[in-house]
Amino acid sequence: MLTPAGQRRLMELQASGGDFGDTGKSFAGATATVVIVTRTEIYCANAGDSRTVLSRAGRAKEMSEDHKPDNSGELARIQRAGGFVEEGRVNGMLALSRALGDFEYKGSPNLAPKDQVVSCFPDIRIEQIDASVQFILLACDGIWDVKTNQQAIDFMMQKLYKGNFSNTRS
């Protein structure tokens, strides 16, 4: 789980505004979906439009939310921060509303990193582990643009139970 200390460090890194010293300022960005599994629980932290889906008895259980600009909560934060959404994109450009980096959307000195036009603050979800948990699938938006959660789980179950990943690409 992203501890309070880990959350603070993430916020500090984002607050640096992408200043990497001698190498200059970076405007690149990335999504992150992270899973930690203990004996009894699965923790998922997500920022962006990568997604984590749990297979529980063959049924897809979404463990993360896609952070898209047209989501009502994300849209409200973007607008409060002085941004706008046009054609499903932050300020008409970025197709997601949370990310690491993308510092050109995080320049308001009066706002905390989690309240910027594009936030770095992850959602965190927890699921209990029981005998019905089979596997966890983490993938980028390229998969989710063409497969539903259940289709992706069905595909993976078919490959797992056949033991055949030779034609599978990551």
Model regions: which residues?
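PP2C/PPM-type serine/threonine phosphatase catalytic domain
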Residues: 1-170
